Amino acid sequence: MSDIQLNTLKPAEGSKHAKRRVGRGIGSGLGKTAGRGHKGQKSRSGGFHKVGFEGGQMPLQRRLPKRGFTPLGQHLYAEVRPSELQLMEAEEIDVQALKAAGVVGQSVRYAKVIKSGELSRKVVLRGITATAGARAAIEAAGGSLA
């Protein structure tokens, strides 16, 4: 293999395409109308319509019905799995501890433990709710909900 030098670097064969030079004479194949065809709105300079415009026909985004909504409180609640509690070092866990450990996002105000995974160590939850299955798993491991 030869020495690579800055003045000998070249792009890979076929990786670069020559720029289309339009309107440069008949022989170029893109002269006169420059590949725009004859007449019509799209052949004119500045002759383009806005995205979604369908020539006056009711556009698709207005023909389709509105659907659903975005709940305003969706970022306030978070679900936590017992396996995530298992990885935390603290024995007493509240929402602030979950935020500090990166288990839930910073905008979360309320957390709920769901039954998904196993818990084998004692944890005390403060200000955190749990489903019936999760509560049973926490209490079986010697923990509690305060």
Curated annotation (Swiss-Prot):
InterPro entries, sorted: Ribosomal_uL15, Ribosomal_uL15/eL18, Ribosomal_uL15/eL18_sf, Ribosomal_uL15_bac-type
One GO BP annotation of this record: translation
Molecular functions (GO terms): rRNA binding; structural constituent of ribosome
SUPFAM superfamilies noted in UniProt: Ribosomal proteins L15p and L18e
Keyword line: Ribonucleoprotein, Ribosomal protein, RNA-binding, rRNA-binding
Region (Disordered): 1-65
Classification via Pfam families: Ribosomal_L27A
Self-association and partners: Part of the 50S ribosomal subunit.
Family matches, as PANTHER family: 50S RIBOSOMAL PROTEIN L15 (PTHR12934), LARGE RIBOSOMAL SUBUNIT PROTEIN UL15M (PTHR12934:SF11)
Function comment: Binds to the 23S rRNA.
Protein name, UniProt field: Large ribosomal subunit protein uL15
